[in-house]
Amino acid sequence: NVNSKVSENNSSSDVVFKVNNQKTMFSIAVSFKYGSKENTKLFLFDLSLNQKIEKDFSFEKNTVINKNIELHENLEVIYLTQKIYSTELKNKESGGEYFYEIKQVSSTDVKTKKINVENHYLPSLSFFCLKDKLYGLGFYSDNADFKYSGIAFFELDSHSLEIKNSKYSSFTQQFILDKYGEYKDKEIKNIVIKNLY
């Protein structure tokens, strides 16, 4: 992940490079802000550097955060996970005022699937592809203090994006005590989900 910032015109850019598990395709995602718009440009190439996909997306500033990109083992598609802030969710009594959306981008079209966070706070959600399934993982909180309460899990069909399974699994009280501790300086600083495949 390469970041660069240009302060004179209030613009910035991010470049992300991703290779599929079979090492037969790679993707480049370029995100940049300029003025009131945020833009994302996606490319997919095979190993002979033949361009398979080029797609552009544009959003109002501060409404969308790109979380991750993922590639299929065999299909020529890019999966883009985004966190989307919605004005319709401003009056929610509890939980985050946003939802997640996963886009399946091919050379001919874009499919989308909306993932609601319900009454939880889900600061981050990342998807990875294994065979014909997409798996999403993220830590969630039940309170606005963002102390993690458990792990959110989603299983989607990688072709249709149909949600096959979803679950919010809460941590045990002992784990929460170990994580946050009785005393501030005794808490566990970070929890990391390692590569699972």
Can you name each region flagged by the protein language model?
Residues 1-8, 57-61, 113-119, 160-193:
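Surface-exposed loop and turn segments in beta-propeller and other repeat-based domains
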Residues 39-50, 93-109, 148-162:
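Beta-propeller blade signature
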